[in-house]
Amino acid sequence: YPLRRQRQMCIRDRYYINGVLQPAPAVTIGPPLVINGITVPAGGNAVIVYEAEVNPYAPLAATGNIVNIATITGGGITPIEVTETVVTDNEPLLNITKSISPVPVTENGTLTYTFLIQNTGNTAADAATAAEIIDTFDPILSNIAVSYNGTALAAGTDYTYNEATGLFATTAGRITVPAAAYTQDPATGNWIVTPGTGTLTVTGTI
């Protein structure tokens, strides 16, 4: 799976000889990426450092990997090929959004905080992940009812809430979110990410 440079340019592109920084070498983006004008002194070494991002064809599932192949060529030497395998980051990747309804809020009315949790990672956020949602409600709610994915949660067991301060926290590991699903577009070859989701709702009186 080819690498592409972020915004079509290296974030960092460093060239060292025996540990001493050198002027940037000539680079052809490609693919393949080609770096020319490298000098390796007798008994010494040269190091090239650059960053790149993977393209949309790279597999994202837990078993996915990218094999990066580099070939060293030059006058009077036999080409040398080296490989490095980069595996996927196998962990949950969570993000959360919060919304309030109804808007506008009426005094002494009922208010609902809704938290949408999305997991774009290839690994589920299970109980062992010990994920928590902690928030200080403003406005503060009283007589709250809490549910996750439509299932009622119990105060003290599944969450804690302080009506004096508005501090709300779910019990570590009570919120679980499935892994994302990955499908490959048959026309383009790009991988499409469908996040795993969970919805926490907290309803109470202002």
Identify the residue ranges that each predicted region occupies.
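Exported/extracytosolic protein signature
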Residues: 5-8, 12-206
